[in-house]
Amino acid sequence: MMFPQSSSRHSGSSHMPQQLKFTTSDSCDRIKDEFQLLQAQYHSLKLECDKLAGEKSEMQRHYVMYYEMSYGLNIEMHKQAEIVKRLHGICAQVLPYLSQEHQQQVLGAIERAKQVTAPELNSIIRQLQVHQLSQLQALALPLTSLPMGLQAPSLPISASSGLLSLSALGSQGHLPKEDKNGHEGDRRPDDDGDKSD
């Protein structure tokens, strides 16, 4: 009776290490698979983060470029406004020295110069658009060396958005140019009048 019990004990003890060995190996395989899955997810997330970082740097470059362009346009608008003020002051100083007939002609020309029609304004905006696009392309040339294929199509959109802001200030920035042209046209009859006198 003792021998079967000892044999059953030996068989049970020999079976347990095999079962433990099998479960440990299976657990290691599962851990390895999960680790590989996590590593693949980490790699994909790292690639996505690198892509987002590249897009962020591109947006920062565009922001700096547009800020510099906007600042330059603002300075130019103030410069043109100051030029118009000075030219208007010169006209006001010269006007009393003209004859009565020439004064009426000059005043009429000044009033006509202040009345800018929509077609004239559209023509001015188109000229500014061509000029701004050439400037944008010149500024964007160093940036196009990067692998960003969406830069070239985005230039007209940004230019049009800049023109929308310019159109709101058109009465302040573009009318002075017309006034200046009007004053230049007004000086010609004045000069003729001076020559005739």
UniProtKB/Swiss-Prot annotation:
GO molecular function annotation: transcription corepressor activity
Location(s) in or outside the cell: Nucleus
PTM characteristics: Ubiquitinated by XIAP/BIRC4.
Gene Ontology biological process: negative regulation of canonical Wnt signaling pathway
Expression sites by tissue: Predominantly expressed in brain, testis and ovary. Ubiquitously expressed in the developing embryo. Present in unfertilized and fertilized eggs.
Biased composition range(s): Basic and acidic residues: 175-197
Subunit organization: Monomer.
Assigned protein family: Belongs to the WD repeat Groucho/TLE family.
UniProt note: domains: Lacks the C-terminal WD repeats.
Protein's name in the database: Amino-terminal enhancer of split
Source organism per UniProt: Xenopus laevis (African clawed frog)
Lineage: Eukaryota, Metazoa, Chordata, Craniata, Vertebrata
Encoding gene per record: aes
